[in-house]
Structures are given as structure tokens and as C-alpha cells.
């Protein structure tokens, strides 16, 4: 296995960092060393008021990680297991010659392989090139930031704010010594976010100030219908496969899950136990896509009528528990 990395990882890779502890089931090694915070309570608010708190129950809590620590940890595990790594490998061409894939970098370097896994995120050009993924890509406009102190955000508590962001929500996830701040809007590919305006309203309620935030805006590719995720010797995983949850913007769990399922399918295929990789698409549809179909429907209603959604949805006695179950991977 050879990992082709376009950029040398920056010291910080800021994202929400939330994922269900159920992801541990896909790894033969413990992930706890890179978990910054274990969430036991989720707080919901409407314009910083009308707050509702839900307790996470069950055996799979919600974990918060620093993305840079997670990436580095998983890369180290892969290298220790015998993977090779090529850095600053900016892929400009992928083509198949006979039964061998040829991958070419901007600087002229070439790699040949029996199979290719496309894992280069929401801006990946390759799904269109190989006619994989949804016919119409759906993007959420998002902002991810970090404040290097915790303010008054309580330990083990994640915050979801539904009133300040048009057609979306904002969040605050605690780390050991910081807070991951974010927001997203989900209904229209052309939607933009008034980041500064929202931060000025949201951060003071957390005991934080806008001058303390370091972050960036980006487009996040979200699930937009069942689609083919594999070709002959080629697979899409993670954001490149449009697997991000269209309701709560959860991206880490489907990225890790799809990586696990891709590896399993490739192993059977390379060993000659199966003739194609079609089982990968079917497995992702069954284990993730069917839930995302419901997530898309909920998103379309909730974010189009957010105040009614908050009153009739989040404030219903059973709703916080349901959202907590989604976050912990039980639904």
C-alpha cells in the first residue's frame, strides 16, 4: 500500500472533530490516546436561549478529537504496518493501462497500482472524471475555527445552536485546552455564511471573543442520494464519496467507515475471492446511505423552517435523546 499525500500536513487541521466512539469497532488498536474529550451531555439552544440539555447514554459516547492528531495517529499506524508514504505528490492524472493504474504527479513522478482509493476530500475532481458519486453534487457552506481556551463551555458538553445560522446551525465542541467552533448552512449550494456576524452573537455566550478565533470557510460535499462508489479497481471514500451527513454534518465517522469497508472489499478482490468491487457500493448504501436518505429529508424540513423545527423537534421530550443516539452511533 502506498499513500499519496498532496500537502505536508499543517500543524493544525481544524474541523468539528466530533465522532461516535463506535468507530473503535473498525480498528485493531485503541483510539483513546488521541481523544481530547468524551461528551456525556449535549446542549441545544435557539439564538443562545431556550436551551435544552440531553444526556448521552449507552456504551458509545461522542468523542471530540483534534483532526491533526487523528490524521497523524492513523498515518503512524499505517506506516508501522508497512505502508509507504509519498509526500507533496500532487496528482494530476489517473489512467488505466491494461489492468494497471498509472498515477502521475505534477512534478512528473509516477506510481503504478492494481487499485486506487480516492480519498482527497470534498474538492476532489476525480469522482466526475470516473463518473462515480452522485450525478449532482451537493455542498454545504461551512466554517471551522478554534479558540485556544475553553471559556465557559462545560467539560464533556457539546453545544448546538440552531437560531443564528440561516438554513443551518453552529456548534462548539470542547477539547482539553481549547474549543472547536463551527457552523454550516445546508439547503442551497450558493448559500454563504455571515461568519463574523454569527461569531459576534455566538461566542460571547460561550465566554469567548471573536478576536481569539483562528479558522477558515470551506465547501463540504454532503450526501445527495445513492450512487455508484466503485469502478473496476477504483473506489471513493469519505468526503470524496459525498458521505457527509446532510443534517448534522458528521464526516469523520463515514470517512473511517468507508475506509474500513474499502480495505475489506479490496482484500477480497485482490485475493481473487470476488470478481468486482460492487459489494463496496452496496455495503455503504446499506450501512450508511439508507440513514442519510432520512437525514436529507429531515434536513430539508428542519432547516427550511428552523424555528418550528426547534420547537416541534428539538424541544419534544424524545427529540434530544434521538439526536444523542445519532451522535453516539446508535441510530
What is the predicted role of each segment?
Residues 264-331:
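C-terminal helical "tail/cap" subdomain of flavin- and related membrane-associated enzymes
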Residues 9-11, 27-43, 134-139, 273, ...:
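A short alpha-helix-loop-beta-strand transition element characteristic
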Residues 93, 110, 189-266:
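FAD/FMN-dependent oxidoreductases across multiple families
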Residues 85, 137-142, 207-219, 277:
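A short coil-to-beta-strand element that immediately follows conserved catalytic motifs
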Residues 1-15:
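Glycine-rich FAD pyrophosphate-binding loop
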Residues 1-2, 110, 116, 235:
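Hydrophobic "anchor" residues on beta-strands that sit immediately upstream
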Residues 37-38, 44-129, 136-140:
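Conserved N-terminal helical subregion
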Residues 121-200:
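Conserved FAD-binding catalytic core of PHBH/FMO-like flavoproteins
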